[in-house]
Amino acid sequence: MNSLFASTARGLEELLKTELENLGAVECQVVQGGVHFKGDTRLVYQSLMWSRLASRIMLPLGECKVYSDLDLYLGVQAINWTEMFNPGATFAVHFSGLNDTIRNSQYGAMKVKDAIVDAFTRKNLPRPNVDRDAPDIRVNVWLHKETASIALDLSGDGLHLRGYRDRAGIAPIKETLAAAIVMRTGWQPGTPLLDPMCGSGTLLIEAAMLATDRAPGLHRGRWGFSGWVQHDEAIWQEVKAEAQTRARKGLAEYSSHFYGSDSDARVIQRARTNARLAGIGELITFEVKDVAQLTNPLPKGPYGTVLSNPPYGERLDSEPALIALHSLLGRIMKNQFGGWNLSLFSASPDLLSCLQLRADKQYKAKNGPLDCVQKNYHVAESTPDSKPAMVAEDYANRLRKNLKKFEKWARQEGIECYRLYDADLPEYNVAVDRYADWVVVQEYAPPKTIDAHKARQRLFDIIAATISVLGIAPNKLVLKTRERQKGKNQYQKLGEKGEFLEVTEYNAHLWVNLTDYLDTGLFLDHRIARRMLGQMSKGKDFLNLFSYTGSATVHAGLGGARSTTTVDMSRTYLEWAERNLRLNGLTGRAHRLIQADCLAWLREANEQFDLIFIDPPTFSNSKRMEDAFDVQRDHMALMKDLKRLLRAGGTIMFSNNKRGFRMDLDGLAKLGLKAQEITQKTLSQDFARNRQIHNCWLITAA
C-alpha cells in the first residue's frame, strides 16, 4: 500500500475525501488543504486519472527537522533518490514555506537540488539535469516551522490542466474548482444545464465530462510519474484503456444537452474550441448573447439548472453595472425559469442578494486568495396571481414621483443638471443627481450603529431601483460615498480617468467630471446664485474667490462683466476654470485666473471690484494656507478685507455651507456694511427639501 496525499483548494477537502473513497482509497484523513490516503499501485493511477477535485497527487518520501540549511541538505540526501528516478531523467524542485533558517524559497530549492544531485554523484552516477519547465520528475518540499515534508509530485503539471483548455486563455476558476462547483449545485446529470455567463465554458465542460463519465485526466499528455523508477506502465495502460472505454460509452448514451452564452464573441469561440478538445463539443450549444437576452431554451420542460460564476468587481465604479446585472438575472429567473434551480458562485455575497431570491443551501470555498460562496436556489413556479417583487419599492416610488416633477421643470428652465432625490426617506440615505444622461448616486456614510452588511445591501437595492426607474444604462451610473456635511472636500482625488462631460446650465456650457473627484466640478445647490451673479454683472468688474472650477465666473462673463478675476489655490481647478471660460468664448486679458491662497491674496490685494462672489470652506487647515480658517469665527475678518476691495456701490455675494451659521450683523454695521439674507431665494425646486444646504447673503455699504 502506498501512502499518498491529494492537495485541493481550501473548502473542498471533504468533497475530495468522498471522491477518493469512491475510487477505492482507504484510511482517508482530511487536513487543511488536502487529504492523506492509502492505496495500491492501481489506485495511484486511478486517482490521477479520475480525481476531478485534486490539485496534485503526491507520494510522501519523508520528513526532516530543519534548524540549519545543513539539516535540510542532509535530510533530503537521506532519501534513496536512485530508487526514485534514473540519472538520465530531468527534475525540478518546488519549495514552499519559510522559517528562521530558510528565509528564501529559492535558496531552499537550491539546497534540495544540491542534495539530490550529490546523491547521484556520490554513487558515481551521472548527475541528473534540472528542467524547470518540463521535468520528468517533480520534487515537492513544504517547510512548516522546523519540519520539512518531502514528496514526489506524481501529477507533474497541476491536475486542473485537463488538456482541453487553450493555455493562452485566462480562466477565472480552475477546472478542479469548477468540478466542485458543479458537484455542489445539486444538478442531476440527464437534466438540462445552462450557464448564461459561461466565459470559456469551464463549468459546462466539467459538467459534461462528469455526466458522460469522461475521466478528467484522459486528455493530458504529460504526467509526473513518467520518470519514476517504480512506474508500472502496464497498470497505467489498463487504467487509461478503461477510461477511454467508459468515455465512449458515456458519450453515446447521454441524451440531455448543455447551453452556454456570453456577451463576448471571442470567449465563446474559445469555449467551442475547448469543448471540442474535451471530446464533448456536440453536447453543448454556445451562443453570443447578453444576459438581458437570456430566455429559457426549454419553456415546455423539462426543468433544469442555471449555473454560473458571474463577474464581480473590486472597484466601486464597477458596482452599478454588476448590481444591475444580478438584479436583472433575478428577474429573468423568476419570469422565465420557474421550477428550475439556480446555483451561483461568487466572491461577492452582497451582489447575490440583488437576485431577490432566498438560497436553500450555501457553500464556502477559496478561489485562489478570494473567499467565495456558492448559493443554491430553487425558483418557484409563477402563478397567474403572482406579481414581480419590487426592489426598494418605497424608494422607487419616491424617485419616480420626483422624476415626473423635476424632469419637466428642468427642461423648461434650460438646465441639464439637477438633484432628483436627497435622502427624502431616512432609510434610503442617498443623494441622486442627474447630469444630462448620466446619474450620480452619493451614499451618505451610514452611522456606525447601522450594520455594515445591511447598509451595503440597502445601497445595492437603491442602485438597482435607480437604474430601473430612470431607464439608464448601468454604465451611466456613478456611485460615490461621502460624509454628510463635512465641508466640500473638493480637492480629494478619487481616480485618474480624466473623462469630462459637457453640460448646460441656463445659457452656460460647463465641463463636469463625474468620476475623478468627490465632487463633480459643479455645485448644483448654487445654480440660482450663479444665475443671479450673471444678471448682476453687466459692465462690472467681477471677483470670484475660492472659485473652484469657475462656473460662477462663466455666468458673470456671459452676463456682460467688464472683467473677471478668478482666484483659487488649486492649479487643477484653475485649469478647469480656464476650460470652462474657453468653452463659452470668454478668453483674453479681461478674464484673469490667479493661483493663490485666497485669504492671503485678499489681505494683500489693492484692486477694486463692483461685484464679489465668495464661497469659502466651512473649515480649512490646508498646509498650503497660512492659517486655519473657520467661517463662523473668521467671517468678520473676511468682511473687513472684502470691504477694502469693494468699489462704492458694489455688492458682495457671500455663501457658505455651515449649518446654523449666524451672520454677525453688529460686526457688519461697525464696518459700515449691511446684509440681506437671500438663502431662500437661491434654493431651487430640487433643493427645496434641504433648506440648510447653504447660506447666502448680499452685502452692501450701509
From Swiss-Prot:
One of its GO terms (cellular component) is cytoplasm. InterPro entries: 23SrRNA_methyltr_KL (IPR017244), DNA_methylase_N6_adenine_CS (IPR002052), RlmKL-like_Mtase (IPR000241), RlmKL-like_Mtase_CS (IPR053943), RlmL_1st (IPR054170), SAM-dep_methyl-trfase (IPR019614), SAM-dependent_MTases_sf (IPR029063), THUMP_dom (IPR004114). GO terms for molecular function: 23S rRNA (guanine(2445)-N(2))-methyltransferase activity; RNA binding; rRNA (guanine-N7-)-methyltransferase activity. Residues 43-154 form the THUMP domain. Keywords: Cytoplasm, Methyltransferase, RNA-binding, rRNA processing, S-adenosyl-L-methionine, Transferase. It catalyses: guanosine(2445) in 23S rRNA + S-adenosyl-L-methionine = N(2)-methylguanosine(2445) in 23S rRNA + S-adenosyl-L-homocysteine + H(+); guanosine(2069) in 23S rRNA + S-adenosyl-L-methionine = N(2)-methylguanosine(2069) in 23S rRNA + S-adenosyl-L-homocysteine + H(+). Belongs to the methyltransferase superfamily. RlmKL family. PANTHER family: RIBOSOMAL RNA LARGE SUBUNIT METHYLTRANSFERASE K/L, RIBOSOMAL RNA LARGE SUBUNIT METHYLTRANSFERASE K_L. This is Ribosomal RNA large subunit methyltransferase K/L.
